[in-house]
């Protein structure tokens, strides 16, 4: 019985480490993706404001 427990324990340990590493990588990828989305949102907010200011300065 002990001969079966030891390999199963090792497999469980390795799987836990693997899942932990995958989770860290996924979190890092989500953070990078969030930064890109924020940059797009800032651009979307910035361009209409600049357009309104320029149209106000030059008049239509």
From Swiss-Prot:
Compartments where located: Secreted
Record-linked InterPro entries: Frog_antimicrobial_propeptide
Disulfide bridges in this chain: none
Recorded GO CC terms: extracellular region
Main location as per UniProt: secreted
Gene Ontology biological process: defense response to bacterium; defense response to fungus; killing of cells of another organism
Free-text tissue specificity from the UniProt record: Expressed by the skin glands.
UniProt superkingdom: Eukaryota
Positions of the pro-segment in this chain: 23-43
Residues making up the signal peptide according to the UniProt record: 1-22
Ranges in coiled-coil conformation: none
Alphabetically ordered keywords of this record: Amphibian defense peptide, Antibiotic, Antimicrobial, Cleavage on pair of basic residues, Cytolysis, Fungicide, Hemolysis, Secreted, Signal
Protein biosynthesis is among the record's keywords: no
Function text: Antimicrobial peptide active against a variety of Gram-positive bacterial strains but not against Gram-negative bacteria. Has weak antifungal activity against a slime mold isolate. Has weak hemolytic activity against human erythrocytes.
UniProt similarity note: Belongs to the frog skin active peptide (FSAP) family. Temporin subfamily.
Protein name: Temporin-CG2
Taxonomic source organism: Amolops chunganensis (Chungan torrent frog)
Source organism phylogeny: Eukaryota, Metazoa, Chordata, Craniata, Vertebrata
